[in-house]
């Protein structure tokens, strides 16, 4: 089997027993399957849920808590137990697990975003297996990923993974809920995530987790946009993970299965940055950006809004509709001076060295509303 990197997301429903508590037996089964991949030369990053499940009974809850404060308290107790279970299980097979706890703010800050990428690559280089979870005990509602499906998609992008595997207790994606409709049709392969399918599938979560099938499809959509192919399905058994990479997985494969990926810089721009302002451009500039792969020059700028500086991320509009985001080489004040001018005139006025308002290497088109 060829070498590569995959991200495996293991949800709470795949890690818990009938009472919703952490099942060490089930966890070790997943670890054994992951180690089988490592033996074959595959780099693996694990995104795991289960901290709440591991901790809630130890602080007196008789069932999985539902309020944010209760879940954060349970996660504070359970995260160390969950990680210890992973470390013990991987150690049995001669591997070292490495814990990373992430929040949405880690991705929003460009320096921290870069550090995540560098740390993951160094861990893989050293033969460790990164085990990632959201930092549930400190995340506030506005800064959460929503669920680990989304987190796993973002991780797959930052590491340029070959595949994202979203393991669940359902064996793939159906056109209807198979529990309600005996005639539900299973999709074995989808090149993309159709909006019509997103409208039909359930957003319901399991009793032990936060992500339903809709969450997984949204994560798949994000991963595909980032250049990572996706598998959604069953993840039980030692050979299961290998079967998935061989195209024999019990589930649904999603994506174009090409090698086209989005650069880490562009990932941060489109999925994580907060625009400091915006500009409106003309039709010629829109064509240059969207169809010809060119940079944006001052001549195509009509107006600017906000209070931004050179180096900030700004949103670009055409006909009052957003078409993308990019890093500006000019401040808002400078753009007001040079909008509509040719490049030589603009450089003469601003004394800048760069001709482009937004260079194509720091531009990302957003043709329609993305899943972030």
From Swiss-Prot:
The keyword Ribosomal protein does not apply. The lineage of its organism: Bacteria, Bacillati, Bacillota, Bacilli, Bacillales. This is Glutamate 5-kinase. HAMAP family: ProB. ATP binds at residues 9, 168-169, 210-216. Residues 276-353 form the PUA domain. It is found in: Cytoplasm. GO terms for biological process: L-proline biosynthetic process. It comes from Shouchella clausii (strain KSM-K16) (Alkalihalobacillus clausii). Keywords: Amino-acid biosynthesis, ATP-binding, Cytoplasm, Kinase, Nucleotide-binding, Proline biosynthesis, Transferase. Its main location: cytoplasm. Signal peptide: none annotated.
